[in-house]
Design a protein with these regions (language model features):
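Glycine/threonine-rich beta-strand-loop-alpha-helix active-site module
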Residues: 70-133
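ATP/NTP phosphate-donor binding region
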Residues: 1-86
Length: 133
């Protein structure tokens, strides 16, 4: 595993997924796409590492390529019900992008998509949850 910081730590390479064991919190939601993360065993390993860290884990699966507003809204609603301390996106750009939008709606349920699209229009995050991709 390798690590560099800019201003956050980035873990990559062999063994990087194991860093999930060091996360602190009570609940984590993992957002994934079509199934490759499950097929190749990464999803099960991520869940196991988070549980080893003492967290309850919930999955939001099936994020489609070029995620729809409806998918983002369903994910945000799931987050509002589950109240995760960590939002973890796994897979390609679509699950990561969708999870980031869900995170904003989770932290600020009344924010509109128009407000979210304004340059520098998003209020400060990490008040309810941290994000990991």
């Amino acid at each position: 595993m390798a690590r560099f910081t800019l201003p956050r730590d980035l873990y990559h390479g062999k063994g990087a997924l194991e860093a999930l064991k060091s996360f602190t919190g009570k609940k984590a939601m993992i957002c994934v796409g079509g199934g490759s993360m499950k097929r190749f065993g990464f999803l099960d390993r991520a869940v196991a590492y988070l549980k080893e860290a003492g967290m309850e884990v919930e999955l939001f699966e099936g994020i489609e390529p070029d995620p729809s507003v409806e998918t983002v809204m369903r994910g945000a609603e799931a987050m509002l019900k589950f109240e995760p301390d960590w939002i973890i996106a796994m897979g390609g750009g679509s699950p990561i992008d969708a999870a980031k939008a869900m995170w904003i709606k989770y932290e600020y349920p009344d924010i509109t998509f128009e407000e979210m699209c304004k340059v520098f229009g998003i209020p400060p995050l990490r008040r309810k949850a941290h994000f990991c991709a």
